């Protein structure tokens, strides 16, 4: 009888990173959620949505020969750059590669599978086991099989000090922390885990808007680079009505010579749709909440959360754009 991988277990957000008694914590990786299974030599590598990804990541298929037969792992596909940072953009660029192109990409930007859960072991369904038992069995697989790249064992801890240390790893691409109850079973498609995503508050310059200046829907943000050029760094989520009304009185339509004249902006990361924007004078500083994910150009990959306008700050006081 063919074993079908279950839907992945999911997580719900937490407002803070406190590790509670009876729970374990793991780093949250900036990659692609994936399930990998091997059964009688047949390897399956599926995305969170059930898409087969093995043709794009042949090194995972080759490495699966070192796993016990009739075994399945839950984890995250990641790519590290030469500096040891997670390179999400390179990971995503590999999705469309096939055949020789996928092989070249595997050599240039090898993917790793960071395993954080065990769903099946040598034909035994382990999803009904408590997390602590699944975790111990997963560690035993890595030890007994002496697994190395492309396999990586995700750290797990019950020590709050270790969690605090992980939260300082944002610069290398750790998105936050996942929390799992030690006695919890693996529940497909259920948000039984908890997650805390690292976000930082920072400043940027409001340089354009979507919608109208009387009622902006989103604000496009910039920062000056080391040569004094205003670079696009990201855009906000939709401000609240109160925030929108406050911002409206602080925006000045752009005069001639705006540095973004003639530019177009994508409606979303990876989207070909462009935004209909109105340029404004790059004078107003905004305080925003952003997470750690950046693209290769140094832009925020996810929308920034509007906190407040900072008319008390000059654009020259905003952190410099870093690519």
Residue ranges and their predicted role:
Residues 1-323:
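Catalytic cores of nucleic-acid ligases and guanylyltransferases
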């Amino acid at each position: 009888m063919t074993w079908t991988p279950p839907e992945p277990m999911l997580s719900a957000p937490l407002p803070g990173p406190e590790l509670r008694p009876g729970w374990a914590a793991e780093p949250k990786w900036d990659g692609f959620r994936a399930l990998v299974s091997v059964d009688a030599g047949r390897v399956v590598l599926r995305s969170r949505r059930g898409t087969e990804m093995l043709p794009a990541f042949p090194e995972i298929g080759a490495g699966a020969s070192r796993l016990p037969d009739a075994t399945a792992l839950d984890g995250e596909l990641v790519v590290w750059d030469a500096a040891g940072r997670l390179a999400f953009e390179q990971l995503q660029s590999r999705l469309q590669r096939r055949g020789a192109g996928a092989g070249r990409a595997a050599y240039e930007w090898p993917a790793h599978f960071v395993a954080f859960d065990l769903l099946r072991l040598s034909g035994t369904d382990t999803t009904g086991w408590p997390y602590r038992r699944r975790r111990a069995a997963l560690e035993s697989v890595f030890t007994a099989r002496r697994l190395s790249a492309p396999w990586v064992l995700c750290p797990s801890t019950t020590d709050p000090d270790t969690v605090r240390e992980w939260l300082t790893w944002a610069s290398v691409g750790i998105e936050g922390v996942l929390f799992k109850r030690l006695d919890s079973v693996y529940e497909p498609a259920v948000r039984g885990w908890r997650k805390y995503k690292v976000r930082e508050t920072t400043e940027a310059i409001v340089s354009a808007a979507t919608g109208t200046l009387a009622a902006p829907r989103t604000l496009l943000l910039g920062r000056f680079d080391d040569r004094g050029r205003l670079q696009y760094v990201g855009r906000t989520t939709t401000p609240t009505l109160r925030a929108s009304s406050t911002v409206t009185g602080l925006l000045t339509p752009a005069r001639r010579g705006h540095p973004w004249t003639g530019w177009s902006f994508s409606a979303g990361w990876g989207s070909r749709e462009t935004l209909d924007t109105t340029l404004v004078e790059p004078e107003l500083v905004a305080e925003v909440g952003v997470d750690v994910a950046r693209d290769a150009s140094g832009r925020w990959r996810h929308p920034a959360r509007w906190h407040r306008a900072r008319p008390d700050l000059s654009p020259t006081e905003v952190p410099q754009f870093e690519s």
